[in-house]
Amino acid sequence: MSSSKRRIETDVMKLLMSDHQVDLINDSMQEFHVKFLGPKDTPYENGVWRLHVELPDNYPYKSPSIGFVNKIFHPNIDIASGSICLDVINSTWSPLYDLINIVEWMIPGLLKEPNGSDPLNNEAATLQLRDKKLYEEKIKEYIDKYATKEKYQQMFGGDNDSDDSDSGGDLQEEDSDSDEDMDGTGVSSGDDSVDELSEDLSDIDVSDDDDYDEVANQ
C-alpha cells in the first residue's frame, strides 16, 4: 500500500472516530461530507453547514478540495459554488496538515477572520470593510435561509436532536448514543466496518519517512 493510500485511510479514520458527523459518499474514503457548525462568538455561531471534501490520489502532498454545500455569506466563499479561497489549503498546504486541522482550525479561522483583500464574494467583502452591522445582519439572514438546524435537517436528513461537535473550536460533550448507526447520515465509532478498519490501521506509521520520500519524489 502506498504512503498516500495509508495516509488517506489514517486521516479519514481520525475524522470518523472524532465527534464530527461524517457521511462517506459511495463508501469512498476520498469523497465525503462533514457536518460543520459555525464558530462560537462569531456571527456564524448558530449556522450549520455541510462541507464537501474530496481527497486527491496523492494526498497529503496535494491539498484536498473543500467547499460548502449549503449557502454561506462570507468574503472568501463563493455563494454559488461554495468554493473556499484559503491560502493554507490552496497555496501553502503542507503534508503535515490533516483533516482535523482543516475542520477544527483552518475553516473556523477563516470564518473568524475573513480576508477582504482577496474576495470571492465582493458584496460580503465590501460590507465587511464599510458596514460591519449590515455585514453581520446579512450573515444571519443567510443562516436563517440556508443554515439553521431545521434547514440542515430538511436538506440533508440526520438526527436533529443528536449532540454535534462544535467545529468552530470547543468540542461539546459526546452524545451518549454516538456508538449507534446514523442511518446513512454519518458513520459512528460503533460501526463494525469502522472498527475493523481501525484495527487494520493500528500498525500504520504515518511518519514513515521512506514511504513519504518515495511518493514525494514521484
From Swiss-Prot:
GO terms for biological process: mitochondrial outer membrane translocase complex assembly; negative regulation of gluconeogenesis; proteasome-mediated ubiquitin-dependent protein catabolic process; protein polyubiquitination; ubiquitin-dependent protein catabolic process. Residues 154-218 are annotated as: Disordered. The keyword Cell cycle does not apply. Pfam families: UQ_con. One of its GO terms (cellular component) is mitochondrion. It is an enzyme of class 2 (transferase). Its EC number is 2.3.2.23. Belongs to the ubiquitin-conjugating enzyme family. Present with 1590 molecules/cell in log phase SD medium. Catalyzes the covalent attachment of ubiquitin to other proteins. Required for the adaptation to the presence of glucose in the growth medium; mediates the degradation of enzymes involved in gluconeogenesis when cells are shifted to glucose-containing medium. Required for proteasome-dependent catabolite degradation of fructose-1,6-bisphosphatase (FBP1). This is Ubiquitin-conjugating enzyme E2-24 kDa. It comes from Saccharomyces cerevisiae (strain ATCC 204508 / S288c). The lineage of its organism: Eukaryota, Fungi, Dikarya, Ascomycota, Saccharomycotina. The gene is UBC8.
